[in-house]
Regions:
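NAD(P)H-binding glycine-rich loop region in Rossmannoid oxidoreductase-like domains
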Residues: 44, 51-89, 102, 120-124
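N-terminal Rossmann NAD(P)H-binding glycine-rich loop of SDR-like oxidoreductase domains
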Residues: 4-24
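Active-site Tyr-X1-5-Lys
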Residues: 131-157
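A hydrophobic C-terminal alpha-helical subdomain
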Residues: 257-297
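Mid/C-terminal beta-alpha module of Rossmann-like enzyme folds, strongest
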Residues: 213-274, 303-305, 309-313, 319-320
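Conserved Rossmann-fold NAD(P)-dependent oxidoreductase catalytic core, especially the SDR/UDP-sugar
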Residues: 95-135
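Substrate-positioning beta->alpha
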Residues: 169-175, 189-212, 220-221
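Flexible, glycine-rich beta-alpha linker
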Residues: 118-119, 157-175
Length: 320
């Protein structure tokens, strides 16, 4: 039986990954996370560990003695005020690297970074070309640099999930669904954009494909994760609306600008609002990533966008 350690297994992607792994009898699973799992049936795999605590991480990894590590644990929100607020990402990966070395049992590891090591719309020249636009993105740049500098002896890869969505997701990627469902989405004509999104089951297929590929094919490589066809946002919104019987009206772009300014103003007072200038910029900026490297490892995605959308809507109606 192969032992797989998942960090951050109580998060969105982690919850779906644990669910997938738990159905395969060849794996013994452990999830180390600071928070409880979202699904109570996954409690048996969970050990409460704060990735920022060096000794606790070493103790947990050494005790489990994993064959494989999938590192998903991170702080992912954009609310931090300083880079140090994201030490779970930077110090966390350093602690994990130390722990894996101490354990001495790991054959492969996959470390999670983020597409936000570059701002939306920026196309990096290579995987050492960084252009973060948030503190979170800066923390993930530092995460990647620490892994590459350590250059561990085992087979390792870095993944950069794009806009992953599906059951058990949260802000910001659930916002799009809720905006459409609450009749708050409006088409903005030619300002609509195309982006790389990814259904969560497809992302898990990609992760597992990296884990199972020949070492020489994936070692020291960086991969963006996402569905292989970029999404025109207008088309996806129409699919959600059609399933739910919702009509989406068209509104001039300048109206969105005003609503974004209102959201900016309310944010200063700690009031959540579905639209801000930052979000509008993201909504109107093409952000299509090169997925050819991961496609060569994981060529056949298991779930179409429309099928994933139907499953996600069923989950929203059941759990939210």
């Amino acid at each position: 039986m192969k032992k797989i350690l998942v960090t951050g297994g109580s998060g969105f992607i982690g919850t779906n990954l644990i669910e997938y792994l738990s159905k395969d009898t060849q794996y013994e699973i452990q999830n180390i996370d600071i928070v409880k799992p979202k699904i109570s049936a996954q409690d048996k795999y969970w050990v409460q560990v704060d990735l920022r605590k060096h000794d606790a991480v070493i103790a947990a990894v050494e005790a489990f003695a994993p064959d494989y590590v999938i590192h998903l644990g991170a702080r992912t929100d954009l609310n931090g005020k300083t880079l140090q607020d994201y030490d779970a990402n930077m110090g966390g990966v350093s602690n994990l690297l130390d722990a894996i070395e101490v354990a001495g049992t790991v054959k492969r590891a996959i470390f999670t970074s983020s597409m936000y090591v570059c701002e939306p719309g920026y196309m990096p020249k290579n995987f050492e070309d960084y252009a973060p636009h948030t503190l979170y993105g800066e923390s993930k740049v530092e995460t990647e640099k620490r892994i590459k500098t350590a250059n561990p002896f085992y087979t390792w890869s870095i993944i950069r999930p794009t806009s992953i969505w599906g059951p058990w997701f949260g802000e910001p990627y659930d916002k799009f669904f809720h905006i459409v469902l609450n009749h708050m989405y409006f088409h903005m004509g030619k300002r609509a954009c195309r982006k790389t999104y990814g259904y969560v089951d497809n992302a898990i297929y990609q992760i597992m494909s990296i884990l199972q590929a020949a070492p020489e094919k994936v070692n020291r490589n960086v991969y963006y994760l996402g569905d292989y066809e970029a999404y025109p946002i207008t088309d996806w919104a129409n699919e959600i609306a059609k399933i739910e019987g919702i009509h989406i009206p068209h509104v001039p772009y300048w109206c969105f600008k005003i609503v974004g300014w209102v959201g900016d103003f309310l944010k200063k007072f700690g009031i959540a609002f579905p639209m801000t200038s930052f979000r509008l910029h993201n909504m109107t900026t093409d952000n299509v990533h090169n997925l050819e490297p991961i496609k060569s490892v994981a060529p056949n995605l298991p779930v179409s966008r429309i099928d994933g959308t139907k499953v996600t809507l069923e989950w929203i109606h059941k759990y939210e």
